[in-house]
Amino acid sequence: MTASRKSSKTPKAAAARTSRRKAPRASRAAAPAAKVRLTAEVSSGGCACKLGPADLREVLSKLPVVRNPNVLVGNETADDAGVYRLSATQALVTTVDFFPPMVDDPYVFGQIAAANALSDVYAMGGKPLVALGIVAFPTGKLPLAVLLRILEGAGERVKAAGAVIIGGHSLTDPELKYGLAVTGTVHPSRVVRNGGARVGDLLVLTKPLGTGIVCTGIKKRVAKAEEEAFATASMITLNDVAGGLLTRFDAHACTDVTGFSLAGHATEMAEASGRVRFEIDSSQLPLLPGTARLADDGYVTGGARRNRDWLGARLAIARDVTPALREAVVDPQTSGGLLVSLAPKKAEAFEKALHARGLRPAIIGRVTARPRTSAVVVAVS
């Protein structure tokens, strides 16, 4: 399958096919520690809480670019993690992510927070080694058993990644937040950056979209049980398999799709790659069950609005793209998939390899040359 070939498969049909499969469980150990609704204790949750990309860039643009011969990846291209060379054969990959809960179960929240933090290391082609926990907890407002379950859930995912949590820091806060600072390793010559996409490449997305929309439905108590189950299963899934195959299939560029949305992170990739444009085939976008229904009913995030405003004219969407898909491309993702740019034959082999390992990737577009006045990311129907 190539991105240039039209398909009759609609996102709703893809979601329907997905929903016919039995929704995987987060964990048999995921019983809540107490009868609390974590989403009712916070104003918003997950990566939808990220500082808006426009505000973040305004501040970061005033800081000096890091100049150090051992810093292989710094703050100049909005990459997923920093990379510091230790020797000719080893470099450190380091990153941090934390946020308020987007689900009600403390154990599952811990799992999602850990998977989300680990993802940045995988997106760079690295392997996680150690993590430090970051806790902001409303002492006296929530029972300590909730915190214990969060830490247990995070520990389960970190252990599954072959890494260990070796410490952390905690403070009291009116709103619950949790996350990890993660350090991993990568060979200096095998770092995969977000810049490097080439004209003619195909774009592979390794997870379905819609976590921000579905989690809004969870918070508002309008998401169906099956919709919540699929979103949860997607968010706790590690990006280790896809990340581990990046160098095998000679990925030219990669990023993980999180709070700045598919369109936002695609724009960062395209701009870091030079005069290229990403053309997204909206008919190929995989959506989590319930995404279209909830989006059509207005359950979208403030983060989506901030993403859309920041992108402005750099994002062009064809008129016949459905309203739900228009929302999905700017929807903030929590623990989303990897967006990978590869040569066509490599992309098809990469997609096939992920399918063989039980994942549901999709080739969603292609990389073209960008005229000087053109949008950076284009979504077509």
Go through each PLM region and give its residues.
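Helix-biased detector of long, well-ordered alpha-helical tracts
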Residues: T2-S381
